[in-house]
């Protein structure tokens, strides 16, 4: 069975403040028609996907995401589908951060997928 996928990481001792100059950097490769979007889980447990997308056309490339001036949409973490737009979410206390591929894969083989490595978050720590 092929489905959408979310990959997220968290710091056990701190939230991340993604306001200001915060950045998410990763080495990524997208294949087929797949693109990935930044995704966060804010302190109240809400999952949000950002409007910026990354498409590398099969090449391994370093990608960097700035969180400012991005549109955010609610994500159902069980179904990995987007919902309504969330205006001005509070990104000062983010519990988890990562990427989401909202397109289901093609099943066996690599009809469409993404690879992710070397994930780096540049943000201010906020004590839990």
Task: Put a short name on every predicted segment.
Residues 26, 68-119:
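Extracellular beta-strand ligand-recognition surfaces/modules
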């Amino acid at each position: 069975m092929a489905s959408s996928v979310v990959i997220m990481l968290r710091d056990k001792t701190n939230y991340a403040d993604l306001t200001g100059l915060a950045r998410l950097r990763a080495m990524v490769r997208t294949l087929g028609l797949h693109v990935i979007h930044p995704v966060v889980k804010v302190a109240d447990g809400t999952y949000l996907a950002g409007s910026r997308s990354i498409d590398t056309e099969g090449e391994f490339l370093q990608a960097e995401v700035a969180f400012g001036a991005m549109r955010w949409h609610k994500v159902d973490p069980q179904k990995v589908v987007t919902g309504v737009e969330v205006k001005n979410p509070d990104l000062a206390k983010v519990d988890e951060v990562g990427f989401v591929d909202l397109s289901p894969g093609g099943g066996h083989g690599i009809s469409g997928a993404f690879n992710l490595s070397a994930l780096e978050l540049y943000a201010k720590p906020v004590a839990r």
